[in-house]
Design a protein with these regions (language model features):
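Short glycine-rich, flexible loops that bind phosphorylated cofactors or substrates
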Residues: 76, 140-141
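Receiver (REC) domain switch/active-site residues of two-component response regulators
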Residues: 130
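Conserved Radical SAM active-site core
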Residues: 1-4, 17, 35-115, 120, ...
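P-loop/Walker A phosphate-binding loop and immediately adjacent motor/lid segment at beta-alpha junctions
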Residues: 86-91, 142-182
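Glycine-centered loop/turn positions within well-structured domains
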Residues: 28
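Short, conserved loop/helix-junction motifs that constitute active-site signature segments
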Residues: 124-127, 150
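N-terminal [4Fe-4S]-dependent radical SAM core
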Residues: 1-22, 31, 35-42, 168-169, ...
C-alpha cells in the first residue's frame, strides 16, 4: 500500500484534533473528488512500519482525539491489510482514541457482507472503527454545510452500535449540520 499524505493536526475529518492518513488507490473516481491524485495506487510513498511508528508518535499528545482514514479508498482490498496492522498497533497503545474512516463503498451493501477482499480482515477492520462515513461523493448532492461529509447521500455510521444491533445506526455525538448556526 502507498499513502498520499499524513496530516497531524486535522480538524475537518472527525471531531476534535485528529491525525489523518490519506491512503493511495481508489476505484470509485467520483466526479468532483477533492483528492484525485490519490486514485492511483502507486501515488505517494510506501506504507511501512516506519510510517506506522510515525503515526503512533503523532497520536501521543493528549489533545489528539483519534485517527481518521481517508483516501484514496481505505477499504480497497489491497489497502485493508496494512490499515488493520496500523489499527492493531494503535489500539494496543491508545485504546481511548477514536478511529474514523471515510469510504465510497456502502457499509451494508459492500463492506459488511465481506465483498471487498478477505472477509476476516474486513471484520477485524470494522472492529476497530468508531465511525464510518460511507457512500461515494456525489457532486450533485454536494453541500458545504454538512458536517464531516461532502455530499448529502453520505452517512455517518456508528459502527459499534450498528454491529451490535444488526442495523444501521447513525452517529449522534455531534452538534448538527452548519445550516442555521451562527
Amino acid at each position: 500500500m502507498n499513502y498520499a499524505t499524513i496530516k497531524n493536526c486535522d480538524i475537518a475529518n472527525g471531531p476534535g484534533v485528529r491525525v489523518s492518513l490519506f491512503v493511495s488507490g481508489c476505484t470509485h473516481h467520483c466526479k468532483g473528488c477533492f483528492n484525485q491524485e490519490a486514485w492511483d495506487f502507486h501515488y505517494g510513498k510506501p506504507f511501512t512500519q516506519a510510517t506506522i511508528d510515525r503515526i503512533l508518535a503523532m497520536l501521543v499528545p493528549g489533545y489528539i482525539r483519534g485517527l481518521t482514514l481517508l483516501g484514496g479508498e481505505p477499504f480497497e482490498p489491497e489497502n485493508q491489510g496494512p490499515i488493520v496492522e496500523l489499527l492493531r498497533q494503535m489500539k494496543a497503545k491508545f485504546p481511548e482514541k477514536s478511529v474514523w474512516a471515510f469510504s465510497g463503498y456502502l457499509f451494508d451493501r459492500d463492506i459488511l457482507p465481506g465483498k471487498l477482499g478477505d472477509p476476516a480482515i474486513t471484520r477485524e477492520y470494522l472492529g476497530y472503527l468508531d465511525v464510518l462515513v460511507d457512500g461515494p461523493f456525489v457532486e450533485a448532492k454536494k453541500d458545504l454545510a454538512l458536517r464531516f461529509r461532502g455530499s448529502s447521500n453520505q452517512r455517518l455510521i456508528d459502527v459499534p452500535k450498528t454491529l451490535k444491533e444488526g442495523k444501521i445506526v447513525l452517529w449522534e455525538d455531534w452538534q448538527g449540520d452548519l445550516k442555521g448556526m451562527k
